[in-house]
Design a protein with these regions (language model features):
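Nucleotide/pyrophosphate-binding catalytic subdomain
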Residues: 1-130
Length: 130
């Protein structure tokens, strides 16, 4: 997916933050994304689900590693909400699924947990997740 050649085009990665849901602008943004013919991968923010994790972390006293994992689950929840907005959207959890979705004319919406949980190259903290 990351390689470029005359036969392949790397998709544009678009972060759809939770603030779009809170301001009511998400449907319009998703309509624009769904209408594009440029290959796109949507990375959802965790939105209100991630906000809940942030609020619970100090009172429930869980560490950054668990907060990171829960934030990825929050991103998955937002992915599920995004895909019901348009038939072109499809939840994906691997590079192969991303490639398949793009090939099939779908807009992949990435749920990151399966790909990056436990990956030492990805910092387990709020800077890396929603």
């Amino acid at each position: 997916m990351a390689e470029n050649s005359a036969d392949t085009v790397s998709p544009l990665v678009v972060k759809v933050g939770g603030s779009l849901a809170e301001t009511g602008r998400m449907p319009a943004a998703l309509s624009l994304i769904a209408a594009t013919r440029v290959p796109v991968v949507v990375v959802p923010g965790g939105g209100p689900f991630a906000d809940s994790i942030r609020a619970l972390q100090p009172t429930m006293k869980f560490g950054e590693a668990l907060a990171h994992r829960l934030a990825m689950l929050a991103m998955h929840q937002m992915a599920e909400l995004i895909v019901v907005q348009n038939d072109r959207f499809s939840v994906v959890q691997s590079l192969a699924e991303i490639s398949d979705a793009v090939r099939d004319g779908k807009v992949p919406v990435w749920a990151p947990l399966r790909m990056i949980a436990g990956d030492a190259a990805v910092p387990a903290g709020w800077m890396a997740t929603s």
